[in-house]
Amino acid sequence: MYIDTAELCDIYLDQIDVVEPIFSSFGGKSTFFGKITTIKCFENNGLISEILEENGEGRVLLIDGGGAVRRALIDANLAQLAADNGWEGIIVYGAIRQLQQLENINIGIQALAPIPVGSDEQSIGETDVPVNFGGVTFFPDDYIYADLTGIILSQEPLDLEEFDSL
């Protein structure tokens, strides 16, 4: 389904939060949306791997990596796992790696920056907790909408019917 965050802002500005423009798009899909699942972890992706093994249909994984860009939280293997399990997208407040492979995986990915260094693989962190970055507080089960223009957040799903005809 087509979405346009600029159009959604024009229609729903009083009902949404707009994330500060600090993210770049890296995955094979430039637009994605869904109900968020949150993870808070630091330079460690073991818990991320566990969550991505779940059915992700209609879901977006939102990772609060503390804004650290010294180690990548998402690589091609994790992105492929997410795509294989139906995840709509991944947003990383941190770094990713293996950009050439990520571009060919059918999943939306937004992150702060790339770096070639991988992360630890211990399952340390928290899931389904509120996280705050980009000027917005994200709660589990909020709805997120992302495209090349930006990222917006809503407590309730937005009506996307009019975009079906575009």
From Swiss-Prot:
- Xref: NCBIfam families: NOT-MenG, PRK09372.1, RraA_entero
Q: Taxonomic lineage per UniProt?
A: Bacteria, Pseudomonadati, Pseudomonadota, Gammaproteobacteria, Pasteurellales
Q: Which GO terms describe its biological process?
A: regulation of RNA metabolic process
Predominant localisation class? cytoplasm
> What Gene Ontology cellular-component terms does the record carry?
cytoplasm
Function, as annotated: Globally modulates RNA abundance by binding to RNase E (Rne) and regulating its endonucleolytic activity. Can modulate Rne action in a substrate-dependent manner by altering the composition of the degradosome. Modulates RNA-binding and helicase activities of the degradosome.
- One term of GO molecular function: endoribonuclease inhibitor activity
Keywords assigned by UniProt, alphabetized: Cytoplasm
What's the name of the protein? Regulator of ribonuclease activity A
Give the location in the cell: Cytoplasm
Domain of life, per lineage: Bacteria
Q: Name one Pfam family in it.
A: RraA-like
Its subunit composition reads:
Homotrimer. Binds to both RNA-binding sites in the C-terminal region of Rne and to RhlB.
